[in-house]
């Protein structure tokens, strides 16, 4: 588990993607994966400090959790990179989820006031 965001971590992702791929092949079902990278994240860290960056990461993780289904598998892969495995999801539906994620993150107002801003 990623200590900062509460999402699965990279190691768990690597285990789960193997499991989900095997299950998808075995059951002949769709499996999609979304890779999400936060634009300009380095600028946030450089301008406001790492505590503010942590607030952004937690905020994005919360948006991901609220946007995807309960059985989808959200992971913080490292830094500002996230992966979401979407079992039993075709490409069109995965695209719709990715667009909802992008829109929800783009429209979010993530509060960094709890961080001691530089």
Could you say what each language-model-derived stretch is?
Residues 73-76, 117:
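A short pre-motif secondary-structure segment
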Residues 52-73, 81, 100, 105:
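Active-site-proximal alpha-helical element of nucleotidyl cyclase-like catalytic domains
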Residues 46, 86-89, 106:
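Residue-level recognition of strand-loop junctions within catalytic nucleotide-signaling folds
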Residues 32-37, 74:
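Active-site-flanking beta-strand signature of metal-NTP-handling nucleotidyl enzymes
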Residues 85-94, 113-117:
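Catalytic strand-loop-helix junctions within cyclic-nucleotide turnover domains
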Residues 1-15, 36-49, 58:
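Conserved nucleotide-binding and Mg2+-coordinating catalytic segments in signaling enzymes
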Residues 15, 22, 43-46, 66, ...:
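Regular, well-ordered alpha-helical segments
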Residues 10-30, 61-69, 87:
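Short regulatory alpha-helical coupling segments
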